[in-house]
């Protein structure tokens, strides 16, 4: 019997919504990356985009373990000499929390063309509302041990 190889036309895409309220950032990122890659499906293939769409809401209420709020830094560079800008995760969580969640999740995807395509199926929102109600996303519950 030959091994089944999924074709891109055979992939069934489902929309998931994850509530990030009081969920540790790393645990959220691993679960979301698994859904984006499609590793939860029985016909997963590493060379085909079999993943689902993931909508993360309440990104501003995500939990950071340890002293990451003060010590962890987000770096960006303008491309000019002396253009390195650093911001603590605490400041970023107060102003633009979706950046922290996106960076954590996309960092767990493959660093190639397929990973970039999978990253486009990630939608992150700081508040509890999102514009994807028409897709009827199913709630995805992240089970975690008490903090």
UniProtKB/Swiss-Prot annotation:
Keywords annotated in UniProt: Ribonucleoprotein, Ribosomal protein
PROSITE patterns on file: RIBOSOMAL_L13
UniProt entry tagged with the keyword Coiled coil: no
Any one of the GO CC terms: cytosolic large ribosomal subunit
CDD domains: Ribosomal_L13 (cd00392)
UniProt keyword Ribonucleoprotein present: yes
Pfam families: Ribosomal_L13
BP-aspect Gene Ontology terms: negative regulation of translation; translation
GO molecular function (one): mRNA binding
Family: Belongs to the universal ribosomal protein uL13 family.
Task performed by this protein: This protein is one of the early assembly proteins of the 50S ribosomal subunit, although it is not seen to bind rRNA by itself. It is important during the early stages of 50S assembly.
Subunit structure: Part of the 50S ribosomal subunit.
Protein name (record): Large ribosomal subunit protein uL13
Organism: Frankia casuarinae (strain DSM 45818 / CECT 9043 / HFP020203 / CcI3)
């Amino acid at each position: 019997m030959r091994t089944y190889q999924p074709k891109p036309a055979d992939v069934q895409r489902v929309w998931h919504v994850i509530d990030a309220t009081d969920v540790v950032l790393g645990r959220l990122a691993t679960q979301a990356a698994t859904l984006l890659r499609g590793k939860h499906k029985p016909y997963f293939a590493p060379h085909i985009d079999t993943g689902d769409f993931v909508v993360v809401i309440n990104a501003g209420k995500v939990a950071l373990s340890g002293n990451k709020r003060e010590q962890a830094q987000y770096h960006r560079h303008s491309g000019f000499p002396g253009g390195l800008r650093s911001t603590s995760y605490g400041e970023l969580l107060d102003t633009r929390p979706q950046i922290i969640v996106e960076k954590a999740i996309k960092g767990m995807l493959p660093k190639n063309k397929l990973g970039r395509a999978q990253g486009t199926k990630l939608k992150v929102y700081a508040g509890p509302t999102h514009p994807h109600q028409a897709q009827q996303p199913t709630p995805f519950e992240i089970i975690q041990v008490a903090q």
